[in-house]
């Protein structure tokens, strides 16, 4: 199975399955002499890990990361950084009923058809549990971006189902508030509505989709490589690679369909840009404005409501998903999306420094 690596100069490779012994990753390209320890990585993992609130899966994992290599006397050496997280709360017996059945809406069918074998326990490699290592790698990228370039990468949940967060102006977002509630939401009124909606869904045994926004501030001009390695193209690739993501928007995204050129173009004055409809990227290259990306995540198919499907023999069957699952996967996706944006930005920054300055 290929496709486990992202990046060119800053490269991240992950491995492991949902119910395997452990998850791990190799991070190549981290510049030397960056002060780094598990304490720099753990906070983002704690934001993503399961079992932290009543709104997410009850599976409880400590998600304690261990650095295996690439750090000496508290600083990166420039060699590959190896990290691992051990799994501890697997209940593989919950998945015995779907060993020979395909859960509708999941990767069960496609993995079986492609490889002729699949790890049915919790989805195996296709499980969002794999993203823990992306978050670990992303924490390193975020630290380097922050300390060496002053770049901040942060995200918030902007919609669950029909409940939308009030429009946010970047400079007015209260990031402490975002990180103080289980929904990563800057709008207190929306938090209450999110709570009601998730409680209702849990009673019904159903799930719901979500939308979240990621913002990178203080990104310099010049990141991105025409024509196939455009910064927005690489961001879209990275964000689409997150489990359950079905759509990515940069800047105004699909709203540009209804805009006119006189409205959409980001006009400039000697003092700078007057708007940011493009989301901080022009011609595939960063413009110096905040980079804004929005992603849409589908409702998880792991629900207790019976669904029609087939088994390995192609026979019609009914599937009821057991186990422990998130009623809305978008809630824990905020730190994952931040990580993917940070990984792409650091990769492009290193490429920019190698080529241009």
Swiss-Prot record:
GO terms for biological process: amino acid biosynthetic process; aromatic amino acid family biosynthetic process; chorismate biosynthetic process. It comes from the Bacteria. One of its GO terms (molecular function) is FMN binding. Its EC number is 4.2.3.5. It catalyses: 5-O-(1-carboxyvinyl)-3-phosphoshikimate = chorismate + phosphate. Pathway: Metabolic intermediate biosynthesis; chorismate biosynthesis; chorismate from D-erythrose 4-phosphate and phosphoenolpyruvate: step 7/7. Disulfide bonds: none annotated. GO terms for cellular component: cytosol. Belongs to the chorismate synthase family. Homotetramer. This is Chorismate synthase. It comes from Haemophilus influenzae (strain PittGG). The lineage of its organism: Bacteria, Pseudomonadati, Pseudomonadota, Gammaproteobacteria, Pasteurellales. The gene is aroC.
């Amino acid at each position: 199975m290929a496709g486990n690596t992202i990046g060119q100069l800053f490269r991240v490779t992950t491995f492991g399955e949902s119910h395997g012994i452990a998850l791990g990753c190799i991070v190549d390209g981290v510049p030397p002499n960056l002060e780094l320890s598990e304490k720099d990585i753990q906070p983002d993992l704690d934001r993503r890990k399961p079992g932290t609130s009543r709104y997410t899966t009850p599976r409880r994992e400590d998600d304690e990361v261990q650095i295996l290599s690439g750090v000496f006397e508290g600083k990166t050496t420039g060699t590959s950084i190896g990290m691992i997280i051990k799994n501890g709360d697997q209940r593989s017996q919950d998945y015995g009923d779907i060993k020979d059945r395909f859960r509708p809406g999941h990767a069960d069918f496609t993995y079986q058809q492609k490889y002729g074998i699949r790890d049915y326990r919790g989805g195996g490699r296709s499980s969002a549990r794999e993203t823990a290592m992306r978050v670990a790698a992303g924490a390193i990228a975020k630290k380097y971006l922050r300390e060496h370039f002053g770049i901040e990468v942060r995200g918030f949940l902007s919609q669950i189902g029909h409940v939308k967060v009030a429009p946010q102006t970047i400079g007015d977002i209260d990031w402490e508030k975002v990180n103080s509630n289980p929904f990563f939401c800057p709008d207190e009124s929306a938090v209450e509505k999110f709570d009601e909606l998730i409680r209702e869904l849990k009673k019904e045994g159903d799930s719901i989709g979500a939308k979240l926004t990621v913002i990178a501030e203080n990104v310099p001009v010049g990141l991105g490589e025409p024509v196939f390695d455009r910064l927005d193209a690489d961001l879209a690739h990275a964000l689409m690679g997150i489990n359950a993501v079905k759509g990515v928007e940069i800047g105004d995204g699909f709203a540009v369909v209804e805009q006119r050129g006189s409205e959409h173009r980001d006009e400039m004055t000697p003092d700078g840009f007057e708007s940011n409809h493009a989301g901080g990227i022009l011609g595939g290259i960063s413009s110096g404005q905040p980079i804004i990306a929005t992603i849409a995540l589908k409702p998880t198919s792991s629900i207790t409501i019976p669904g029609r499907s087939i088994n390995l023999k192609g026979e019609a069957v009914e599937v009821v998903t057991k186990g422990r699952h998130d009623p809305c996967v978008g809630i824990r996706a905020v730190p994952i999306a931040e990580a993917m944006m940070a990984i792409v930005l650091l990769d492009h920054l290193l490429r920019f420094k190698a080529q241009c300055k």
